[in-house]
Curated annotation (Swiss-Prot):
Group of enzyme by EC: ligase
Pfam family for this entry, one: SYY_C-terminal
GO molecular function ontology, one term from the record: RNA binding
Sequence motif: 'KMSKS' region, positions: 231-235
Organism: Lactobacillus helveticus (strain DPC 4571)
Recorded catalytic activity of this chain's protein: tRNA(Tyr) + L-tyrosine + ATP = L-tyrosyl-tRNA(Tyr) + AMP + diphosphate + H(+)
Domain of life: Bacteria
Keywords associated with the record: Aminoacyl-tRNA synthetase, ATP-binding, Cytoplasm, Ligase, Nucleotide-binding, Protein biosynthesis, RNA-binding
GO biological process: tyrosyl-tRNA aminoacylation
Purpose: Catalyzes the attachment of tyrosine to tRNA(Tyr) in a two-step reaction: tyrosine is first activated by ATP to form Tyr-AMP and then transferred to the acceptor end of tRNA(Tyr).
Protein name from the UniProt record: Tyrosine--tRNA ligase
Subcellular location per the Swiss-Prot or TrEMBL entry: Cytoplasm
């Protein structure tokens, strides 16, 4: 049986930007079944967002093809900060912040990668033991300052200034690759396009210390841009986080289901674990029947299930279906808060109030005349029920959990009214 060509699959998915030695890597994959690869992330926050997820999708694909992924948590480098992609110096974190973030990221990675054929390492294990004299003697002599300055990550910062701390980051990342290659048999490093200089520095160090024939490869992924030219990964509300406390499964699902037709096939190739045939079928449906949004729905299903599990996906779909149909009575308060987090909101007192006055006082309607007209025309719903009587009283005692009255105007214009 022919071995699955992981590199060819990644190329078809548009997931490869640069490779240090494509021929050498292909040869290694053809002759060995034991490839180990890694991608690092510094614990600068307590959650990854979907922009961070991009390189780890590549690791996941290698894992599914039978190879051994290693996630490197930068407990050592995270105390310094990667200058890549930044115009200014990072604010240094406390040891307690770094430790807390390490624990959070480790838990997220375990959810994504499981427990088999996968490991998490922390570069504090070796960098934390490295003293200054050993650093300069054993590693510093292999790095030429003129070469370091010419690397894009440093060159882009020279005009505004870069500290010695961040300047040496590429050496520390090179030591990481060297350590994992020598002691753990890791041959391939994956990173974003801005990591090219750091990756090649690591390969150079490995070859200088272990010999030019030592297998060591690098692969970077392209910068992902939307069809409008803006950077992928942000919603109107900011970053889309993997932590359900920061971005609920519903919000996460909505981010994917609202993707542009021009982008959705690209994202399916990258983020969904679907075959070429399935993706090509969805691409055809998008071209012929874009209004059905079949590709967006499948994309949202696949990525939400990967990050939040089957339960998270089902909850996101339940909230979506309820808000779309207007049948909101079976939603819990938590689900209502998720689904209407970004909807218009208002406050009202705890006393009964005529619906016309309620709509005007909460600024859902601009005037009593307009309120009466919309009520009579059947455009107003209170807690899921259509109300067509101008004499109807809104009773806060029937609010969801005694807390919320939900007004829908028209098909899907919701307002969340909090009872005070």
């Amino acid at each position: 049986m022919a071995k699955f060509d992981i590199l060819e699959d990644l190329k078809w998915r548009g997931a490869i930007n640069q490779e240090t030695d494509e021929e050498g890597l292909r040869k290694y994959l053809a002759e060995h079944d034991d490839l180990a690869l890694y991608c690092g992330t510094d614990p600068t926050g307590d959650s990854l967002h979907i922009g961070h997820l991009i390189p780890f999708m590549i690791l996941k694909r290698f894992q599914m093809a039978g190879y051994h992924p290693v996630i490197l948590i930068g407990g050592g480098t995270g105390a310094i900060g990667d200058p890549s992609g930044r115009k200014t110096e990072r604010t240094l974190q406390t040891a307690d912040q770094v430790k807390h973030n390490e624990e959070c990221l480790t838990n997220q990675m375990k959810k994504l990668f499981g427990t088999e054929n996968f490991e998490i390492r922390n570069n504090a294990e070796w960098l934390g033991k490295l003293n200054l004299i050993d650093f300069l003697r054993d590693y510093g002599k292999f790095f030429q300052v003129n070469n370091m300055i010419n690397k894009e990550v440093v060159a882009s910062r020279l005009e505004n200034g870069i500290s010695f701390t961040e300047f040496t980051y590429q050496i520390l990342q090179a030591i990481d690759f060297y350590h994992l290659n020598k002691d753990d048999g890791v041959q391939l490093q994956i990173g974003g396009s801005d990591q090219w200089g750091n990756i090649t520095a690591g390969i150079d160090l490995i070859h200088k210390l272990e010999g030019a024939d030592r297998p060591a490869f690098g692969l970077t992924i392209p910068l992902m841009l939307k069809a409008d030219g803006t950077k992928f990964g942000k919603s109107a509300g900011g970053a889309v986080w993997l932590d359900p406390e920061k971005t609920s499964p519903y919000e996460f699902y909505q981010f994917w289901i609202n993707q542009d037709d021009r982008d959705v096939v690209k994202y399916l190739k990258y983020f969904a674990f679907l075959s070429r045939e399935e993706i090509e079928d969805l691409a055809e449906k998008t071209e012929k029947e874009p209004w059905k949004r079949a590709a967006q729905k499948r994309l949202a299903e696949e990525v939400t299930k990967f990050v939040h599990g089957e339960a998270g996906l089902k909850e996101a779909q339940m909230i979506t279906d309820a808000l779309f149909s207007g049948n909101i009575k079976n939603l819990s308060v938590t689900q209502i808060e998720q689904g209407l987090k970004n909807a218009p909101s208002a406050e009202a007192g705890s006393e009964k109030k005529n619906l016309v006055d309620f709509l005007v006082d909460t600024k859902i309607e601009p005037s009593k005349r307009q309120a009466r007209e919309d009520i009579k025309n059947g455009a107003i719903y209170v807690n899921g029920d259509r109300e067509q009587s101008v004499d109807f009283d809104v009773d806060p005692s029937s609010a969801f959990d005694g807390k919320y009255v939900i007004i829908r105007k028209g098909k899907r214009k919701y307002t969340l009214v909090t009872i005070k």
